[in-house]
Amino acid sequence: MPVRATKRGAARTPLHGEWDVVICGASFAGLTVARELARTDARVLIIDRYEIGERQTSACAAPTTWLEYMGLMDSVQQTFGELVVHTPGRTQRWSLPFTFSTFDYRRICALLREQSEGSAVFETATIKGPPARTGFTVHTDRGDVSAPLIVDALGWRRILGPGANVQPPDARLSRGLEIHPHARGDDLELWIDPKYVKRGYSWSFPADGELRVGVGSFDPRDHVKEPTVQLAEDVGVPAERWQGNWIPHQLRPATEDGIFFVGDSAGHCLPTTAEGIRPAFYFGLALGRELVDVVEGRQTREQALTRYGAFSHDHLWQYRWLLRVQNWVGRITPTRLLTPAIRAISPPGLVRWAFGSYRDICPPEYVLNRSRSGVLERQQTIGVSAGPDGQRAEVAGDGVHQQRPGDDQLQQASSQSM
């Protein structure tokens, strides 16, 4: 087995001290928070069990515009303007209203780290516990670190939350497993097929000489290794270079007991698609900007907790709709309704509307709008998406659809297919 780069032996010196901000977790969400704090004089400590970029758990794809606006294009490997969707006996090719790109995980983490250098110090350390913290002191295997502002970006376990956490298979989690064989492909592909998983989907994401092929189940009780082996055989690639993870599919409170939660620890991964990178960027920016206001004296910690918590909660209706779609897909996948249902939602105008609305949940323009704080930026951003008939529908200035386009259509389609 490969030896990880994590510090060992004499290199693991004691770690103690007080900081302005402690960020626990050094992947997409945590590094994005640190990126925003780089424009301040705050003393920021980032800690993670692994070195930055060391432990990939994602298929690593995101809307290209997000990568462009975040200054991360140097990590891009392949870009796709279409999505190929396979169901039993039929294949649909959807032309998307925006492109997705696969990227190199180690490189994108390095780029994010470069954007936070200057104020943030990174150290490898493992959070101990329970308890993982006492008040505003975090307990690690190298010592205790304290800060008035603490961020949990450690993933679905929500380690810094108060009380015991529900574990799989009882938690609201999906499970995913994938392989990374050395192979090439031209298409971003999905399989919605009970041959592989009854409640979920399978995928193949090409990434410049590597195929990321995997299976995800909405039901954490379902085993996904055998289906992944079967999919690899069908795609014609060896089942090698494995990775997997649990994936949250329900929004959770973004603040609790004085702690800020972002990314998977707050359930920010989008249901149905299990897209977690874009919301990690999005909510990481919002949280980072709130913390900037605290360290620069424009608001208190309590105000930041309230504002960031409200910002995350403002998206609850969108997460609930995606969870309904996820449940609907799970119900029809084992039935004969699956293929005709996917065919019914495949007209180009409907695809453009659906993906446009999906895009606007975490719009890339949010990166560029750097006004006083995350909540204000959300209020000032007007999201626009095309309806099924090609008409465009605005999102109100408070971040909530004045007329949520398509709710009636989605509800009608769901009821007809159930």
Task: Report residues per predicted region.
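FAD/FMN-dependent oxidoreductases across multiple families
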Residues: 129, 144, 219-296
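Extreme N-terminal leader/targeting segments of oxidoreductases
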Residues: 1-19
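A conserved beta-strand/loop capping segment in the N-terminal third of enzymes
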Residues: 64-113
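Predominantly flavin-linked oxidoreductase catalytic cores and closely associated redox partners
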Residues: 115-240, 251
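Glycine-rich FAD pyrophosphate-binding loop
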Residues: 38-57
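Glycine-rich Rossmann-fold phosphate-binding loop(s) that bind the pyrophosphate
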Residues: 25-27
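A short alpha-helix-loop-beta-strand transition element characteristic
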Residues: 53-54, 69-84, 169-171, 301-302, ...
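C-terminal helical "tail/cap" subdomain of flavin- and related membrane-associated enzymes
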Residues: 292-387, 407
